[in-house]
Amino acid sequence: MSWVENMKNQENISRIVELIGQRAGNIFTARGYCCSETVIVVINQGFRGDLSPELAVRLGSGFCHGMGGAGCICGSLAGAEVALSLFLGPRQHGGMKSKEFEKVAKEMHDRFRARFSATCCRVLLKRRKEKNGATCKELTVGGAEIAAQLLLEQRPELAAKVDLEFLGARESKLGTLAKKLLGRE
């Protein structure tokens, strides 16, 4: 690959990661999903995964608020790990070998910690209350962005599968409420 092609590829990857983050922030706010639910939905739909949106949400529900309110691992990080597993996990066609995937999963953890200085929901929320930490929305955006970056580093061909229509769409709380009332969601 030439230097110019490499630069274009990097710009494309950066744009996809940015769109993933924006869509995660939008869905977190508009649909009222928790962090883990949002990350799984956005990565799955953004990269045209094979889970239905409903199943993607259900998979993330137990990780909300640091494992069901326990305050342990941040749901955004847990959701990102699940999302990476959907595309890279070893027990699927085309998945990575277990040891290779473990390195990617650890890298997700390490990048999240480097960006937000912690991985524990309780610690992250305490920092937020002290006014020097990220909001849950910011953690959700960050978790989705890091997962997308890692996914594209491992499987760059996924850039061609990205659902730009889904990633570019924007919803509002009012629109989401109207869909629920009309039975369209």
Language-model-derived ranges and their functions:
Residues 2-31:
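Polybasic, low-complexity association/targeting segments
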Residues 5-16, 43-62, 114-121:
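Acidic-glycine-rich active-site phosphate/pyrophosphate-binding loop
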Residues 20-49:
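Active-site-proximal helix-loop elements at catalytic-domain edges
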Residues 22-30, 63-71, 127-132:
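A short glycine/serine-rich beta->alpha loop
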Residues 24, 39, 59-64, 143:
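Short alpha-helical scaffolding segments that buttress acidic/His motifs in well-ordered protein cores
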Residues 46-58, 86-103:
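Phosphate-handling active-site elements
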Residues 78-87:
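DPxDG-like acidic metal-binding loop motif
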Residues 101-181:
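C-terminal binding/interaction regions
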